[in-house]
């Protein structure tokens, strides 16, 4: 998707580079110097700097547009908590509920090995 957004930039940059190479091949300086109406001309170095500045400005503009689109897409996504209905999750929720409850239930409650450490134990680990 990002490649499709950069393809117009690639086309424009290729055309600009082609034009810059074409301007170097054609002796335009002699025609510009011969016309008295053209007082301001750019040297080759100034033309290259101007072209580089234009390309850099265009790239910065496209990057800003992409960032704004990504921020707009990112803000529309809402975070949702995953619901877990497996036996493990239900057991964890019940153990949490029992541990938080007070009164007589807490006095008679013997804690079981419920948690990440309890699962996957072998029998020899439990007997030791």
Curated annotation (Swiss-Prot):
UniProt-annotated location(s): Secreted
Principal localisation: secreted
Endpoints of the signal sequence: 1-25
A single GO BP: smooth muscle contraction
Keywords, in A-Z order: Amidation, Cleavage on pair of basic residues, Disulfide bond, Hormone, Secreted, Signal
UniProt KW Heme keyword: no
GO MF annotation terms: calcitonin receptor binding; hormone activity; identical protein binding; neuropeptide hormone activity; protein-containing complex binding; signaling receptor binding
Pro-peptide region(s): 26-80, 125-128
GO cellular component: axon; cytoplasm; extracellular region; extracellular space; hippocampal mossy fiber to CA3 synapse; neuron projection; neuronal cell body; neuronal dense core vesicle
SMART domains registered for this protein in UniProt: CALCITONIN
Gene3D superfamilies the record matches: 6.10.250.2190
Disulfide bonds: 84-89
Tree of life domain: Eukaryota
Modified residues (Phenylalanine amide): 119
Family classification: Belongs to the calcitonin family.
Function as written in the Swiss-Prot or TrEMBL entry: CGRP1/CALCA is a peptide hormone that induces vasodilation mediated by the CALCRL-RAMP1 receptor complex. Dilates a variety of vessels including the coronary, cerebral and systemic vasculature. Its abundance in the CNS also points toward a neurotransmitter or neuromodulator role. It also elevates platelet cAMP. CGRP1 can also bind and activate CALCR-RAMP1 (AMYR1) receptor complex.
PANTHER family hit by this protein: CALCITONIN GENE-RELATED PEPTIDE 2, CALCITONIN-RELATED
Name of protein: Calcitonin gene-related peptide 1
Organism: Rattus norvegicus (Rat)
